[in-house]
């Protein structure tokens, strides 16, 4: 005999008073993106993922350009506009801007989150394949150093 059980859960909705105070701080709305802007190169010279990245800013608009690793050399991805996020993870008490950018290469989609931590650009990359190739979707984190 299979017994069924009912699980009930109380969901608590957050009000502004429940949020991280940094999200309500007007200074968080004016964070600097200077540390993100520029050319970055992967710290792993043998990477099979992203070789380099350029982050540009025009007024309040961010553009991310990526060069992936290919058998014949670097593969330039289509440029993507990025959304600025408040990076609340503090480094020496300073908050900064992080970016979210999505890339559509037809055969795959890449969702990226970029932030600087201790002078290193950290990219969290979620890849989903769209080409029915049977390849596994994956999550990866890569690290980059500034190369201006």
Kindly give the residue locations of the regions a language model identified.
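Central antiparallel beta-sheet cores of small beta-barrel/beta-sandwich binding domains
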Residues: 34-36, 41-110
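Exposed beta-sheet edge/beta-hairpin loop segments within beta-rich domains
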Residues: 111-116
